[in-house]
């Protein structure tokens, strides 16, 4: 139900009404509305009840198991929210002078340092405000590096077929031609295909390790040596860093640039479009091209902003100010609460949960896409057999899971696995929760055999039933408009 459907003529909330003297005559006539805005006429209680009711229908990490593959939907500690909301942080304006921002700048400086050490990079920039923007930043620096060397013929970016969809999109946005590298039958990058693709046109390769298949590529050092020998650079998509946090450093694998998703690995709230944070780290080659502003130590031990005047080869700023401050603070508090040993435990339990759940799913009769490999932090189940024999699809399983109180895993991604579920149980989930998920999947598998139509019509218990996805894609009518009788 839309809030407009509760609207009644003349119903208003006047507690916050402006004074009668609030004038509009200071505005030029051409900027004044000719007609009142089409807003719902509702009371304050109507508004509260409407949005409270909607919030109770949400699936979220605070209410449900949320095994959305490659999204790391882990618990967000409330201590991080509380401390990041201290008045000194909330009341600081982005334009506050450096001398009055030393506490905030100290937090950012320490976060830069911690993230650089955790990943084996020389330094970090916290400016990117999302994972995709972090990707763009990293690839833009690769382009700037080659252009600064006069290597303008390096116009090709290598991207595995198991990559996130943002990887080829980012490479294209930065002006590169994308060349896809296949995955071999065991889930690693096909080295023969890689070597054939390398040449003087190669700018670099974009990799996630562990990959979106949940598999750690055993040949990463060979890949790094081959790409570097060809004159290219290695970009690390940090989407799956949760699996190796504190255990393995991308810099030690040979990566030249990395982006992190603080809103995933470092446990800040995400979903619904934001907010995010995608810091980038670099080795020595790309250091001059890092975006600004960054935080540096000034003489006397204080902190200051580095600007384009300090970094003449920078690719420039990415936004009006400096990143999503609230997300950065929450991530800083998170790493300080955990410490190095705590971050190692994140990787331990992330991998443990993924491998336990994968084994339970296999024992329950589900087909793992790569049964010969150990899961990094997530794994892929293929329902190709069920689709062929029973006529039920990954979508049907996902919709039915909602009825049973579980958010669905990622479906139909990665694209190279047919009818797949990409399942990531973060480290904060208990064994009991994982067992309950397996029981739900077993129930759905039984229903698929006995009553497949039950799955095809799911969900049955939610306010919104099965949507017409074709119509929704073709008729993008998202704005409410009053009907004639209204």
From Swiss-Prot:
Which cofactor is recorded for it? pyridoxal 5'-phosphate
Recorded E.C. number(s)?
1.4.4.2
Which ranges of the sequence are coiled-coil?
A: none
For this record, an example GO cellular component is: cytosol
Give a short account of what the protein does: The glycine cleavage system catalyzes the degradation of glycine. The P protein binds the alpha-amino group of glycine through its pyridoxal phosphate cofactor; CO(2) is released and the remaining methylamine moiety is then transferred to the lipoamide cofactor of the H protein.
- Could you tell me which PANTHER family the record lists for this protein? GLYCINE DEHYDROGENASE (DECARBOXYLATING), MITOCHONDRIAL, GLYCINE DEHYDROGENASE, DECARBOXYLATING
Family matches, as NCBIfam families: PRK04366.1
Under what name is this protein listed?
Probable glycine dehydrogenase (decarboxylating) subunit 2
From which source organism is this entry? Nitrosococcus oceani (strain ATCC 19707 / BCRC 17464 / JCM 30415 / NCIMB 11848 / C-107)
Q: Which gene holds the coding sequence for this protein?
A: gcvPB
């Amino acid at each position: 139900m839309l809030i407009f459907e509760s609207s009644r003529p003349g119903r208003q909330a006047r507690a916050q009404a402006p004074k009668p003297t609030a004038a509009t005559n200071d505005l030029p006539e051409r900027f004044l509305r000719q007609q009142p805005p089409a807003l719902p006429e509702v009371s304050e209680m109507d508004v509260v009840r409407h949005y409270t009711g909607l919030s109770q229908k949400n699936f979220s990490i605070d209410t449900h198991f949320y095994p959305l593959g490659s999204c790391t939907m882990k618990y967000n500690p409330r201590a991080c929210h509380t401390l990041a909301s201290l008045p000194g942080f909330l009341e600081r304006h982005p334009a506050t002078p450096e001398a009055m921002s030393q506490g905030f700048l100290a937090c950012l400086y320490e976060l830069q340092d911690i993230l650089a050490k955790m990943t084996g990079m020389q330094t970090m920039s916290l400016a990117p405000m999302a994972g995709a923007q972090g990707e763009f930043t990293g690839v833009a620096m690769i382009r700037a590096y080659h252009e600064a060397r006069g290597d303008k013929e390096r116009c090709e970016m290598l991207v595995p077929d198991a990559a996130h969809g943002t990887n080829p999109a980012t490479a294209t946005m930065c002006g590169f031609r994308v060349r896809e590298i296949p995955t071999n039958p065991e889930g690693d990058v096909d080295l023969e295909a890689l070597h054939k693709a390398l040449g003087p046109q190669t700018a670099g390769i974009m990799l996630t390790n562990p990959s979106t298949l949940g598999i750690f590529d055993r040949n990463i050092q060979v890949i790094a040596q081959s790409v570097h020998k060809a004159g290219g650079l290695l970009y690390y998509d940090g989407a799956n860093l949760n699996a190796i946090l504190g255990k393995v450093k991308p810099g030690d694998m040979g990566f030249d640039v990395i982006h992190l998703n603080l809103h995933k690995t470092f446990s800040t709230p995400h979903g619904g479009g934001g907010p995010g944070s995608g810091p980038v780290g670099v080795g020595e080659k790309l250091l001059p091209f890092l975006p600004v502003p960054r935080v540096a130590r000034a003489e006397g031990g204080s902190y200051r902003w580095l600007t384009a005047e300090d970094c003449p080869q920078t690719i420039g700023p990415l936004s009006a100010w400096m990143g999503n401050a609230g997300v950065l603070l929450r991530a800083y508090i998170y790493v300080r609460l955990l410490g190095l040993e705590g971050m190692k435990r994140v990787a331990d339990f992330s991998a443990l949960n993924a491998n336990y759940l994968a084994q339970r799913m296999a024992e329950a009769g589900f087909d793992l896409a790569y049964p010969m490999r150990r899961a990094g932090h997530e794994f892929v189940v293929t329902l190709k057999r069920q689709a062929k024999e029973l006529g039920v699809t990954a979508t049907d399983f996902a919709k039915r899971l909602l009825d049973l109180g579980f958010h669905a895993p990622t479906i139909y991604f990665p694209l190279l696995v047919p009818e797949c579920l990409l399942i990531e149980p973060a480290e904060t989930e208990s064994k009991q929760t994982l067992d309950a998920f397996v029981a739900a999947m077993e129930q759905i598998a039984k229903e698929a055999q006995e009553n497949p139509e039950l799955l095809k019509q799911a969900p049955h218990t939610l306010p919104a039933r099965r949507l017409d996805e074709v119509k929704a894609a073709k008729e993008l009518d998202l704005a409410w408009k009053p009907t004639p009788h209204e």
